[in-house]
């Protein structure tokens, strides 16, 4: 996936420190399962590296994570390390290799023949930033939000097909401006 490399590095670092790790694939159901396991007391801390489920929730598409996504750990006061991985694009289910009319003016890539991935820009990316910070407003503390310096995933890294530094800057500024004071921001 578009976040696999960074996730694998993080897994190695957690293992070196003796943490037991459970990975959830951020495709909607994965995020919902993670939030449920937190509510049931089965998870004691969160490295939430993939927020594409939030973007998809905002736009009502494939990987929508549901209304509780990105809220439970903060409400419970669980330690969190957060990163907006994959939040700059959507995953839209389409007929094979078909570009939806409303997204033809966007940069895009096909993740697979039936998963269309457009880059979010302007007001679109601002909506996602606002939703992320709104979901985090109940965070009690013990949380860090990391803003990556080289893109939010494989598609948005230098040389990536969805690289858009102007949109990244807009997104990050909105995240900075809306981030609750209870969350430490790291760049």
Regions found by a protein language model. Give the residues of each.
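A solvent-exposed, charged loop/short amphipathic helix patch at secondary-structure junctions
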Residues: 98-116
């Amino acid at each position: 996936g578009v976040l696999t490399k960074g996730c694998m590095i993080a897994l190695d670092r957690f293992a070196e420190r003796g943490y037991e790790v459970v990975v959830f694939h951020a495709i909607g159901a994965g995020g919902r399962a993670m939030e449920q396991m937190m509510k049931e007391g089965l998870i004691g801390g969160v490295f939430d590296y993939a927020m594409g489920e939030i973007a998809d929730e905002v736009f009502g598409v494939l990987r929508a994570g549901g209304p509780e996504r990105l809220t439970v750990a903060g409400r419970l006061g669980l330690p969190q390390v957060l990163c907006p991985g994959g939040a700059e694009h959507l995953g839209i289910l389409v007929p094979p290799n078909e570009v939806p009319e409303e997204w033809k003016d966007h940069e895009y890539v096909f993740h697979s023949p039936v998963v269309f991935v457009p880059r979010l820009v302007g007001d679109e990316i601002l909506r996602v930033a606002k939703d992320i910070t709104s979901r985090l407003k109940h965070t009690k503390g013990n949380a860090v939000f990391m803003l990556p310096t080289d893109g939010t995933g494989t598609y948005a890294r230098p040389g990536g097909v969805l690289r858009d530094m102007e949109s990244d800057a807009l997104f990050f500024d909105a995240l900075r401006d809306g981030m609750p004071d209870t969350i430490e921001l790291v760049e």
